[in-house]
Amino acid sequence: MSYTARAAKHPSPVAQRLLRLMDTKKTNLCASVDVKTTAEFLSLIDKLGPYICLVKTHIDIIDDFSFDGTIKPLLELAKKHNFMIFEDRKFADIGNTVKSQYSGGVYKIAQWSDITNAHGITGAGIVNGLKEAAQETTSEPRGLLMLAELSSKGSLAYGEYTEKTVEIAKSDKEFVVGFIAQRDMGGRDEGFDWLIMTPGVGLDDKGDALGQQYRTVNEVISTGTDIIIVGRGLFGKGRDPEVEGKRYRDAGWKAYQKRLQ
């Protein structure tokens, strides 16, 4: 089913917007921009913006972070290039704690990030806590991804853990929009249409010295991925982000069209 067709039936406003955006821009590429200065962060995103549907941030690694200096320009770039924002916070505490972590502190994630994510380790309370924080913080729709599987070597997120995480996701059809996973997570027979976002996607490298394992674009899209997450493949090792952004966007879209046939 096409992204637009899925958007028409999706219960989540966040997922609807993202799926339509993907079809409009003809991209299923999410850029993971992990750099340490605001200037480099914003410069890379401005260059990658035309090619992406989503930017994934780790906002707490930016050394000179400020809300006015980092977040406000990020939101302007999102508007300029028509992409959404995913803060890869990986919440993993009890509901009451994550509620404060999501809405408050220095980063105030719920104010600006369309999507965030969480581990299932503490149970379904984490979904409730994050949803409450979103509702109390902003009138803008927000979405949550559950971490069902990871791309790192030796990850413990598999088997029964993954199955239990899927069960937690079923607790909220509107707020939980999908998973960080390596494959399709099912659910359609129960009325769910989860977005699958997959990190560890590379057209060139096979991995790194710290346990990251890369799979090809065609491989992940053919096994159910909706959005490919690419980081260093776009700008690491002296790569040109505009050249690589176009390359990964085209590869991702071609693989998606092949899946539709």
UniProtKB/Swiss-Prot annotation:
SUPFAM superfamilies: Ribulose-phoshate binding barrel. The keyword Chaperone does not apply. SMART domains: OMPdecase. Pfam families: OMPdecase. One of its GO terms (cellular component) is cytosol. Substrate binds at residues 34, 56-58, 88-97, 214, 232. It catalyses: orotidine 5'-phosphate + H(+) = UMP + CO2. It comes from the Eukaryota. GO terms for molecular function: orotidine-5'-phosphate decarboxylase activity. One of its GO terms (biological process) is 'de novo' pyrimidine nucleobase biosynthetic process. Its EC number is 4.1.1.23. The active site is at K90 (proton donor). CDD domains: OMP_decarboxylase_like. InterPro entries: Aldolase_TIM, OMPdecase, OMPdecase_AS, OMPdeCOase_dom, RibuloseP-bd_barrel. Gene3D superfamilies: Aldolase class I. The keyword Repeat does not apply. Pathway: Pyrimidine metabolism; UMP biosynthesis via de novo pathway; UMP from orotate: step 2/2. Keywords: Decarboxylase, Lyase, Pyrimidine biosynthesis. Belongs to the OMP decarboxylase family. This is Orotidine 5'-phosphate decarboxylase. The lineage of its organism: Eukaryota, Fungi, Dikarya, Ascomycota, Saccharomycotina. The gene is URA3.
